[in-house]
């Protein structure tokens, strides 16, 4: 219960408000029929999209309100919402590593100090900021996770920026990279951040 009330709900409220600020719908209205640029009619879904989106991303549950996994402009209208949603998926796993580092560090400190644990552990810590923030073990795990993320992001970005050779042979321009299956609004770079962190 404490995790829900002290971590998930506050992050969900803040993240949901940020998504609403950027244009993600948050209402209880029904679907709206709009006229498109081509003159056709289109049904646009509405509802509590922002609240469900941020909960989906914090819990890495997948799916989505519309079922397109944040690939629609309704669930993900701007680059800022894209970054909010991507980083919210990395928030809790990163916090777990920090928590682990702090828990292990405190136990190690108490084991070394014995009965004088309070005086030794609560004294002024002369270690670096990262060692104090993550703990020694947490810093190592977080660095390993970060290195794997950067390597994966680099490989994905390089591969996708090369374009599709089959489409190049067909005479299609590949100057923007491989845009097949990518969100045109965000391009290759923003799309690859989403792929690399999963």
Place the predicted regions along the sequence by residue.
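Membrane-proximal intracellular helices of multi-pass ion channels
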Residues: 1-195
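Calmodulin-binding IQ motif helices
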Residues: 198
């Amino acid at each position: 219960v404490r995790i829900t009330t002290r971590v998930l709900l506050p992050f969900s409220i803040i993240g949901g408000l940020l998504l609403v600020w950027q244009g993600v719908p948050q209402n209880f209205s029904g679907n709206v029929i709009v006229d498109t640029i081509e003159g056709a009619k289109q049904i646009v879904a509405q509802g509590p999209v922002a609240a469900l989106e941020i909960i989906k991303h914090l819990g890495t549950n997948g799916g989505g309100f519309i079922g397109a996994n944040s690939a629609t402009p309704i669930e993900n209208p701007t680059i800022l919402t894209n970054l909010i949603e991507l980083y919210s998926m990395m928030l809790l796993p990163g916090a777990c590593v920090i928590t682990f580092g702090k828990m292990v560090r405190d136990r190690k400190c108490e084991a070394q100090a014995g009965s004088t644990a309070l005086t030794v552990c609560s004294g002024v810590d002369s270690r670096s900021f990262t060692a104090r923030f993550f703990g020694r073990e947490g810093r190592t795990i977080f660095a390993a996770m970060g290195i794997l993320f950067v390597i994966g992001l680099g490989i994905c970005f390089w591969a996708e920026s090369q374009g599709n050779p089959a489409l190049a042979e067909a005479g299609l321009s590949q100057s923007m990279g491989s845009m097949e299956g990518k969100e045109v609004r965000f391009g290759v770079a923003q799309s690859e951040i989403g792929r690399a962190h999963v």
